[in-house]
Amino acid sequence: MGLDTLSNSLKDAMKKLAGKTVIDRAAVDELVRDLQRALLSSDVNVKLVMELSKQIKARSLDEDLPKGINAREHVLRIVYQELVNLVGKEAEFSLKPQKILMAGLQGSGKTTTTGKLCRYFQRKGLKVGAIGADNFRPGAYAQLETLCKKINVPSYGDPKEKDAVKIVKDGLAALKDVDVIIVDTAGRHALEDDLIDEITQVNAYLNPDHRWLVIDAALGQAARDQAKRFHEAIGIDGVIVTKMDGTAKGGGAMSAVAETQSGIVFIGNGETIDDLERFDPNGFISRLLGMGDLKALVEKAEESMNAEDVDVNAMLRGKFTLNDMYKQLEAVQKMGPLKQVLSMLPMGNMNVPSDALEGTADKMKKFRIIMDSMTPQELDEPALINTSRMIRVAKGSGSSVEEVRDLIKYYKMMQKTLKGFRGNRMAMGKMMKQMQKGGMGPMGPM
């Protein structure tokens, strides 16, 4: 579900072109037809698809070939660039004290997204608070309050008060000591006049630094009218597209938003409070095409694993214990679903089956449960774990002895891999520098 179908179709089209011995008009025409089918099935507007097709054809056949690349690479780069243009620019914002007004229809995921935004700014080191100004939907503030309590973020709301402006006024006073204030407003089932009137009044009083619209990806290209109406009312300067993991129309919604010139600021791609991703058009398209997004991967890893938790240099010198492996597994789990993490790696056209990913994630959880039954000495000195200790650990963790053996095998494989890295650190450094070069970095492997 989600963007998987679009991604697989795009990767297949690129793979087919990469296998051509001659890149001529016929090859470009075939590529464009494949791209059209993929984009139209994701509910991208026909007019936009035709414009993109025209651009790819014209540039592929008429542009002079840049030095250092062949015709095949040139066409693939053009496709990449035009797809980036299709999904539009990213909306800019700074990590500083600010007020953010949230807008959107009922059911778009606005309140949940407000909670996710609180978590995002909190993880960036800012004091954040939320105001629940949605008294139209029963239970809206209770939902927001629950989300905020989970992450120890202060919130303000008054379910008995019907005046949204009064709630915002009192909320600003209650949260005067925080850096970032996010205001959740009321939605409706349609773009009704009273909704527009209320949010216009709240906007005038709050005078926010940003006005972000939350849109359900399932709307597809219909998102355009919604974004346009809200923009006319309060001046939307960023859009958050939610539920990207649950619809095939995400591409349509994103391209529709791009038409309004309101850049996308985040995309929601899961149900947990950490499932909110800063939108980067280059990285997003790179992942769709199977070229990974190393920048996003590094950011996720840095957020999930504190530098003091794992001594990477010690690992590369050969000191790698079960304790280290436990911390690694914990960090990977914090980074989000395994499928999402793997999509950030440049894996080309390699599609890992969903059941295989689920099995791997389950095994990682099982390994942590087994290690929870080990003594500190065993975690620091895995060589001590003999058969009798395996039996004890298996009983303590509700596992089989065979599963404990699997864990030890996995540990030894990791240890061996790290020793291999130690011998190739210079080569690794050179490779990472190549990957991190600006411009068209993600296109490197193609």
UniProtKB/Swiss-Prot annotation:
In which residues is GTP bound? Answer: 104-111, 184-188, 242-245
In which domain of life is the source organism classified? Archaea
User: What does the entry list under GO cellular component?
Assistant: signal recognition particle
InterPro entries for this protein: AAA+_ATPase (IPR003593), P-loop_NTPase (IPR027417), Signal_recog_part_SRP54_M_sf (IPR036891), Signal_recog_particl_SRP54_hlx (IPR013822), Signal_recog_particle_SRP54_M (IPR004125), SRP/SRP_N (IPR036225), SRP54 (IPR022941), SRP54_GTPase_dom (IPR000897)
One GO molecular-function annotation for this sequence?
Answer: GTPase activity
The record's subcellular location field reads:
Cytoplasm
UniProt EC number: 3.6.5.4
Q: Which Pfam families does UniProt cross-reference here?
A: SRP54 (PF00448), SRP54_N (PF02881), SRP_SPB (PF02978)
What are the record keywords, sorted?
Cytoplasm, GTP-binding, Hydrolase, Nucleotide-binding, Ribonucleoprotein, RNA-binding, Signal recognition particle
What is this enzyme's catalytic activity, as reactions? Answer: GTP + H2O = GDP + phosphate + H(+)
Gene3D superfamilies documented for this protein: P-loop containing nucleotide triphosphate hydrolases, Signal recognition particle SRP54, nucleotide-binding domain, Signal recognition particle, SRP54 subunit, M-domain
Gene Ontology BP annotations = SRP-dependent cotranslational protein targeting to membrane
Subunit structure, briefly? Part of the signal recognition particle protein translocation system, which is composed of SRP and FtsY. Archaeal SRP consists of a 7S RNA molecule of 300 nucleotides and two protein subunits: SRP54 and SRP19.
Domain observations: Composed of three domains: the N-terminal N domain, which is responsible for interactions with the ribosome, the central G domain, which binds GTP, and the C-terminal M domain, which binds the RNA and the signal sequence of the RNC.
Function comment: Involved in targeting and insertion of nascent membrane proteins into the cytoplasmic membrane. Binds to the hydrophobic signal sequence of the ribosome-nascent chain (RNC) as it emerges from the ribosomes. The SRP-RNC complex is then targeted to the cytoplasmic membrane where it interacts with the SRP receptor FtsY.
What's this protein's family per the entry?
Belongs to the GTP-binding SRP family. SRP54 subfamily.
Name of this chain's protein: Signal recognition particle 54 kDa protein
Originating organism: Methanocorpusculum labreanum (strain ATCC 43576 / DSM 4855 / Z)
